[in-house]
């Protein structure tokens, strides 16, 4: 059985197939990253995207452009939202963020599951409405 590995054509075919797989995965990762949306967690800028595969590759591509990247997906079997965090910059420790949500990991890669009833948007900072905008809305609504 090992003799087939001595045949260069078998090796060349494997390299050729591997290059197709690599090109495909790079294309998918690029397209997923183009859909990333900016949000904030604890005032830190993040890019978030729905993705169930290639988390490391997506996180590696997104994280240099923000404080850290968030990839999430709904796990149909477990019936829960799974969240993966990736950081590039030294100043960020995503394991601390993950711990706040009951998860864990390492400084540059961590994750957690959202409890039932929680949505991914629940983990992000809420936009602040300035008093001026709030009073303007109130005045418009009363006239």
Labelled PLM ranges:
Residues 1-36:
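Hydrophobic, aromatic-enriched interface-forming segments
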Residues 26-143:
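Gly/His-enriched, cation/cofactor- and phosphate-binding structural elements
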């Amino acid at each position: 059985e090992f003799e087939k590995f001595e045949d260069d054509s078998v090796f060349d075919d494997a390299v050729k197939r591997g290059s197709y797989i690599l090109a495909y995965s790079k294309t998918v990762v690029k397209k997923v990253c183009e859909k990333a949306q900016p949000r904030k967690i604890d005032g830190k800028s993040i890019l978030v995207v729905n993705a169930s595969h290639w988390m490391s590759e997506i996180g590696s591509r997104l994280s240099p452009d923000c404080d850290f990247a968030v990839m999430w997906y709904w796990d149909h079997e477990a019936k829960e939202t799974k969240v993966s965090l990736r950081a590039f910059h030294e100043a960020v420790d995503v394991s601390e963020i993950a711990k706040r949500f009951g998860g864990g990991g390492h400084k540059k890669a961590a994750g957690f599951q959202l409890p039932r009833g929680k949505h991914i948007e629940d983990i992000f900072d809420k936009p602040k409405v300035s008093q001026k905008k709030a009073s303007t809305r109130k005045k418009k609504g009363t006239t």
